[in-house]
């Protein structure tokens, strides 16, 4: 039903930390037994997805889109990002809200930024 029910992701700038920082295991609702009500416990199934982060340099006016052909002119550089997920909490909260609290507790980011200029020879 993902075509008909909007899914919201929730994140905070304050949850972005440098890779290597200790991550506190999140707590949330979990319902492992369908016969019992959900319980509020620490996550038991924690993982992360490796992603590519982009640093935007040149800005644009608020509310003004950037044409796809001009997008690269606005990118300063890239870095590796780990998007952490509390999968057991996510399984419970996913419908109808989407992965809200299960994905908002931590994002780790590489301390290194590779500029687009440095990547040019590898295009």
Model feature map: region roles:
Residues 1-123:
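Active-site microenvironments in enzyme catalytic cores
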């Amino acid at each position: 039903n993902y075509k008909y029910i909007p899914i919201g992701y929730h994140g905070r700038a304050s949850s972005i930390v440098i890779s290597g920082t200790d991550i506190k295991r999140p707590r949330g609702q979990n319902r492992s037994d369908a016969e019992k009500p959900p319980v509020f416990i620490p996550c038991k199934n924690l993982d992360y997805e490796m992603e590519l982060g982009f640093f935007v340099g040149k800005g644009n006016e608020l509310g003004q889109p950037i044409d796809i052909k001009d997008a690269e002119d606005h990118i300063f550089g890239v870095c590796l990002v780990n998007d952490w997920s509390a999968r057991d909490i996510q399984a419970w909260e996913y419908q109808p809200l989407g992965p809200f609290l299960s994905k908002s507790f931590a994002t780790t980011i590489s301390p290194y930024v590779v500029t687009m200029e440095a990547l040019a020879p590898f295009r």
